[in-house]
Amino acid sequence: MNPVQDKPTLFVVHCIDTEGPLSESLEATFERLENSLDIRLKPGRETLRRIQSGELNLGDKTEGARAVCAPHNLEYNDSWPKVDSMLDEMLSLEYRQRFPDSEGHGCIFNWFAMDHVGFDENPRLRDVGYLNIFDHYREKMQETGANGDELHFHLHPASTYRQGHISATSYLRSPHLLEGLARRIVDRTWFPSCFRAGFYTERPDSHWFLEQWFPFDFSNNATSESATESMQQDIGGGRFGDWRRAPDDWSHYHPSHDDYQIPGNCRRTIFRALTVGTRMRLLKQSDVDAAFARASAGKPTALGFSDHDFRDMRKDVEAVYSMVRRSAEKFPNVRWVHSGARDAARRVLDLSLIHI
């Protein structure tokens, strides 16, 4: 028996919003800047460089603009060959073993795959169609023998005007949600157990829908809002991804019927997952320390973090596991393990595995 198995355990869950390739033109970047911060500038490479460096004085919005236009955020995998080039390395045993957990096991990835359907305009050149992304990753996992990885479900509701680059929140007005799930059952003999909300956004209609179908929800990204985040109109004040009232101590919870953000008597369990490699609600060293401290106190804990496959995730993986290693040194009594989302939920909740 490995002696570390007698220690308190922290389950580290890498959640990937799996959306396939994404392209964004220079003009679209400046349009997004205007929508987020109400900054209207003539698109240009030199202007973008000055925003990124902070040379362009935009008053109290300077840092917000730098966050929206950060170089890493704009380095998109804009084709399947680029995505696959990244995956070929990340899914290899050699790469996984660069980040061993307390038991020496390599990292595990959780692919929350979505369908790009329900829109007529596709300026970001998404791979449109049911099961396209699901099938691509399922085949890739089989090719590489990624037996520890898990495949799950991710959804972005359709915009009212059927524009693929516009974020929306209404599940009631997104019939492709039901068809996407039905196709997974009928065409692939598969149904998800874990879910992540697009743009981290839930509201009453999605809350009650999820309650009927998904036992495990990894959408909570509650954290204190920074000044840079609060000035961004699309995310500030809970506009998208409102988890301001939700637990931010890495505790999991059954939500209330009337408010998905507070503990109650609903059946599904919501877990926390903070973001990396983006412009909001970022995982910090203090967050990782808090997860280790909770586990050290004997409380079953899952530390979730999330990013997107349309960016180079290797930088994110390196950054997160550097933080994990530092925390592990502070809490030597804690055994930390890479985990699938479903497996972590089962273990944290002490659920028995039932074969049907």
Regions found by a protein language model. Give the residues of each.
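Short acidic, S/G/P-rich loop/turn micro-motifs used as interaction or catalytic elements
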Residues: 19-22, 116-121, 160, 278-283, ...
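Conserved small/polar residues in nucleotide/adenosyl-binding loops
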Residues: 354-356
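Active-site beta->alpha N-cap acidic-glycine motif
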Residues: 2-141
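Long, repeat-rich segments with strong aromatic
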Residues: 284-319, 323
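Active-site-adjacent pocket scaffolds in enzyme catalytic domains
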Residues: 2-46, 55, 123, 186-190, ...
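Structured alpha-helical segments in the cores of large, soluble enzyme domains
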Residues: 91-100, 137-144, 173-185, 287-294, ...
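A short acidic (Asp/Glu
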Residues: 24-25, 120-125, 162-166, 203-212, ...
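Metal-dependent polysaccharide deacetylase catalytic core of the NodB/CE4 family, i.e.
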Residues: 109-201, 305, 340
